[in-house]
Amino acid sequence: MQSAMFLAVQHDCVPMDKSAGNGPKVEEKREKMKRTLLKDWKTRLSYFLQNSSTPGKPKTGKKSKQQTFIKPSPEEALLWAEAFDELLASKYGLAAFRAFLKSEFCEENIEFWLACEDFKKTKSPQKLSSKARKIYTDFIEKEAPKEINIDFQTKTLIAQNIQEATSGCFTTAQKRVYSLMENNSYPRFLESEFYQDLCKKPQITTEPHAT
């Protein structure tokens, strides 16, 4: 079940317009929700950091079923700024970016992109058809729970294509969402406090010599 905060998404993933006719109280409530959500996800990501001792070497534990993300080095985090694909290729980078999008109420964009990546790898015609329908009902159709912001013409084309699903059913929509994230959310992510903290090299403290 989607939370109330998640359903209150801004589909084009742009800053909320404070001039909208919803009143100052509604806007204040939205901003409070956003701050709470961001704090929650920053806490979760910090937990991943604290439970990852050595970059590049995952911690193993028989009792732990939760995937542990490895703390990136500052050098690795800096690579994410070189290209959007560098960020998406990093498991921790992807987790951090998803948290950022969730704080902006537009996590559906990265979820749709990831669903399309999985869809394109599907070989079975039966599974392809089933996944196509699920992606359509989750992200494309009107009033979908995670509806993405694409034009009506593209939506209509997808509705026709999924009748006989192929791996290219969502190509146009995926490119649209990728471009939206790359040109809109990605630059703001690079300017975020959380990302800047990851890029900082740890300060080396020296203990005073005993006399």
UniProtKB/Swiss-Prot annotation:
<dbReference type="GO" id="GO:0005730">
    <property type="term" value="C:nucleolus"/>
</dbReference>
<dbReference type="InterPro" id="IPR024066">
    <property type="entry name" value="RGS_subdom1/3"/>
</dbReference>
<dbReference type="GO" id="GO:0060135">
    <property type="term" value="P:maternal process involved in female pregnancy"/>
</dbReference>
<dbReference type="InterPro" id="IPR016137">
    <property type="entry name" value="RGS"/>
</dbReference>
<dbReference type="GO" id="GO:0060452">
    <property type="term" value="P:positive regulation of cardiac muscle contraction"/>
</dbReference>
<feature type="region of interest" description="Necessary for membrane association">
    <location>
        <begin position="32"/>
        <end position="66"/>
    </location>
</feature>
<dbReference type="GO" id="GO:0045471">
    <property type="term" value="P:response to ethanol"/>
</dbReference>
<dbReference type="GO" id="GO:0005886">
    <property type="term" value="C:plasma membrane"/>
</dbReference>
<dbReference type="GO" id="GO:0001965">
    <property type="term" value="F:G-protein alpha-subunit binding"/>
</dbReference>
<dbReference type="InterPro" id="IPR034947">
    <property type="entry name" value="RGS2_RGS"/>
</dbReference>
<dbReference type="GO" id="GO:1900924">
    <property type="term" value="P:negative regulation of glycine import across plasma membrane"/>
</dbReference>
<feature type="region of interest" description="Necessary to inhibit protein synthesis">
    <location>
        <begin position="79"/>
        <end position="116"/>
    </location>
</feature>
<comment type="function">
    <text>Regulates G protein-coupled receptor signaling cascades. Inhibits signal transduction by increasing the GTPase activity of G protein alpha subunits, thereby driving them into their inactive GDP-bound form. It is involved in the negative regulation of the angiotensin-activated signaling pathway. Plays a role in the regulation of blood pressure in response to signaling via G protein-coupled receptors and GNAQ. Plays a role in regulating the constriction and relaxation of vascular smooth muscle. Binds EIF2B5 and blocks its activity, thereby inhibiting the translation of mRNA into protein.</text>
</comment>
<dbReference type="InterPro" id="IPR044926">
    <property type="entry name" value="RGS_subdomain_2"/>
</dbReference>
<dbReference type="GO" id="GO:0045744">
    <property type="term" value="P:negative regulation of G protein-coupled receptor signaling pathway"/>
</dbReference>
<dbReference type="GO" id="GO:0061052">
    <property type="term" value="P:negative regulation of cell growth involved in cardiac muscle cell development"/>
</dbReference>
<dbReference type="Pfam" id="PF00615">
    <property type="entry name" value="RGS"/>
</dbReference>
<keyword id="KW-0734">Signal transduction inhibitor</keyword>
<keyword id="KW-0963">Cytoplasm</keyword>
<keyword id="KW-0131">Cell cycle</keyword>
<dbReference type="GO" id="GO:0005737">
    <property type="term" value="C:cytoplasm"/>
</dbReference>
<dbReference type="GO" id="GO:0007283">
    <property type="term" value="P:spermatogenesis"/>
</dbReference>
<dbReference type="GO" id="GO:0010855">
    <property type="term" value="F:adenylate cyclase inhibitor activity"/>
</dbReference>
<keyword id="KW-0539">Nucleus</keyword>
<keyword id="KW-0597">Phosphoprotein</keyword>
<keyword id="KW-1003">Cell membrane</keyword>
<feature type="domain" description="RGS">
    <location>
        <begin position="83"/>
        <end position="199"/>
    </location>
</feature>
<dbReference type="GO" id="GO:0060087">
    <property type="term" value="P:relaxation of vascular associated smooth muscle"/>
</dbReference>
<dbReference type="GO" id="GO:0005096">
    <property type="term" value="F:GTPase activator activity"/>
</dbReference>
<keyword id="KW-0472">Membrane</keyword>
<dbReference type="GO" id="GO:0005829">
    <property type="term" value="C:cytosol"/>
</dbReference>
<keyword id="KW-0343">GTPase activation</keyword>
<dbReference type="GO" id="GO:0005634">
    <property type="term" value="C:nucleus"/>
</dbReference>
<dbReference type="GO" id="GO:0017148">
    <property type="term" value="P:negative regulation of translation"/>
</dbReference>
<dbReference type="GO" id="GO:0050873">
    <property type="term" value="P:brown fat cell differentiation"/>
</dbReference>
<dbReference type="GO" id="GO:0001975">
    <property type="term" value="P:response to amphetamine"/>
</dbReference>
<protein>
    <recommendedName>
        <fullName>Regulator of G-protein signaling 2</fullName>
    </recommendedName>
</protein>
<comment type="subunit">
    <text>Interacts with GNAQ. Does not interact with GNAI1 and GNAI3. Interacts with EIF2B5. Interacts with PRKG1 (isoform alpha).</text>
</comment>
<dbReference type="GO" id="GO:0010976">
    <property type="term" value="P:positive regulation of neuron projection development"/>
</dbReference>
<dbReference type="GO" id="GO:0009898">
    <property type="term" value="C:cytoplasmic side of plasma membrane"/>
</dbReference>
<dbReference type="GO" id="GO:0055119">
    <property type="term" value="P:relaxation of cardiac muscle"/>
</dbReference>
<dbReference type="GO" id="GO:0010614">
    <property type="term" value="P:negative regulation of cardiac muscle hypertrophy"/>
</dbReference>
